[in-house]
């Protein structure tokens, strides 16, 4: 992760030396793609400095789908048509990619790495992909009836114990690994880069917050510590800045959803079994009932964290099915922002004087562009 961030800093240094404004969302997209391919799959890419990266182009195309696209809207409104609409949407994306399905291209690349790992023992690496290749799935060969248990009945306990041990394990299939790796690739790329772009915009717009964050970073460095895993998690103001950024601009707006497991009567509303319930994350993050002056960017509102223990703050979902990569994403975002602010002062570009133009994608709320200028900081300040 650190090596990828240092490459990003080189890219930003070149931009700062030119003195021109540029679109930073693309820079962060390249960073997160580089990080996820290295850490999850052990793949070295040139995506950060290669303007014609086929990997990035294919991934961007997958996320091009808008929430209000007719095909997607119909699929969401009519569950019985969802599979048909999904296939139609894949066809549309394939046509936009000159007949090459980007999903297939990415899966083929992952499959190639898997086959290399299996055929060449020396190719093994300490990463997520290798963990999946070495892992096994436990499956039941019988059903266990917990109701058999009675206090003090040792015969029944032995019977149930026999059923518990009557299991077998199998390795994950290649198809399962490819599907899981594909999901990790996409999840690790889009959401974190979106959060970073929004944070850069807010820091450029609120120079006082940027100055406070720089002061916290400088104090850490003056104590002889480096910006790394063990230290960025000890920067409370940085944590507040990122938390407030994701409150105002939650990257994911349709992540927290659940199917009703049974019929529920919620006040005057009847929720039948099987109905999909989606939490309006952006709306909840801007509800004045939960947040005082919700449209104001104020990192200090997270000093006491009054709302984060409930279900009014959902950038990573909630409950046992929340985002599995939450800690990874938070660490990546903290390192990227801390290093960037330490090296550069972020200012809004002329193209970004107006409010952000936000695109409502299928799962994410992404900025159409975040134009900024960078000024290199004096090493002695």
Show which residues each predicted segment covers.
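Conserved cytochrome P450 K-helix E-x-x-R motif and the immediately C-terminal K′/meander segment
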Residues: 108, 112, 227-267, 288, ...
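Conserved cytochrome P450 K-helix/beta-meander segment immediately N-terminal to the heme-binding cysteine loop
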Residues: 279-306
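Classical protein tyrosine phosphatase
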Residues: 42-47, 53, 190-215, 271-274
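Cytochrome P450 heme-thiolate "Cys pocket" and heme-binding signature region
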Residues: 182, 187, 267, 303-333, ...
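Conserved, non-catalytic sequence blocks in retroelement Pol enzymes and Pol-derived host proteins
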Residues: 22, 97-99, 119-123, 186, ...
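Cytochrome P450 heme-binding "Cys pocket" and the immediately downstream C-terminal segment
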Residues: 207-210, 326-364
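Cytochrome P450 heme-thiolate monooxygenase catalytic core
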Residues: 1-194
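C-terminal helix/juxtamembrane-tail motif
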Residues: 364-381
């Amino acid at each position: 992760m650190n090596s990828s961030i240092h490459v990003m800093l080189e890219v930003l240094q070149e931009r700062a030396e030119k003195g021109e404004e540029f679109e930073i969302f693309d820079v962060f997209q390249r960073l997160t793609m580089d990080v996820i391919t290295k850490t999850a799959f052990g793949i070295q890419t040139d995506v950060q400095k290669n303007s014609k990266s086929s990997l990035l182009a294919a991934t961007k195309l997958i996320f091009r789908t808008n929430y209000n696209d007719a095909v997607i809207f119909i699929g969401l409104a009519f569950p019985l048509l969802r599979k048909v609409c999904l296939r139609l949407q894949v066809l549309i994306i394939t046509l936009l990619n000159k007949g090459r399905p980007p999903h297939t291209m990415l899966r083929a690349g992952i499959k190639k790495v898997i086959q290399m790992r299996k055929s060449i023992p020396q190719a093994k690496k300490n990463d997520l992909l290798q963990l999946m290749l070495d892992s096994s799935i436990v499956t039941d060969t019988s059903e266990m009836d917990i109701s058999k248990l009675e206090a003090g009945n040792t015969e029944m306990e032995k019977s149930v114990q026999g059923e518990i041990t009557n299991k077998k394990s199998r390795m994950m299939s290649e198809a399962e690994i490819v599907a899981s790796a594909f999901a990790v690739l996409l999840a690790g790329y889009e959401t974190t880069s979106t959060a970073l772009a929004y944070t850069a915009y807010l820091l450029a717009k609120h120079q006082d917050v940027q100055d406070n964050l720089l002061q916290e970073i400088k104090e850490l460095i003056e104590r002889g510590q480096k910006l790394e895993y063990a230290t960025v998690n000890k920067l409370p103001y940085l944590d507040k800045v990122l938390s407030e950024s994701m409150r105002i601009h939650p990257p994911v707006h349709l992540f927290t959803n659940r199917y009703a497991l049974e019929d529920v009567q919620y006040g005057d509303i009847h929720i039948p079994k099987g109905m999909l319930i989606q939490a309006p994350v952006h709306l909840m993050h801007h509800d004045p009932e939960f947040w005082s002056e919700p449209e104001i960017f104020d990192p200090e509102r997270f000093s006491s964290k009054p709302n984060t223990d409930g279900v009014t703050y959902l950038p990573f979902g909630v409950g046992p099915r929340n985002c599995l990569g939450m800690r990874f994403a938070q660490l990546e975002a903290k390192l990227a922002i801390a290093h960037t602010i330490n090296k550069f002062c972020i200012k809004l570009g002329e193209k970004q004087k107006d409010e952000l133009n936000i695109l409502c994608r299928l799962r994410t709320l992404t900025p159409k562009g975040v134009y900024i200028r960078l000024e290199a900081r004096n090493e002695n300040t």
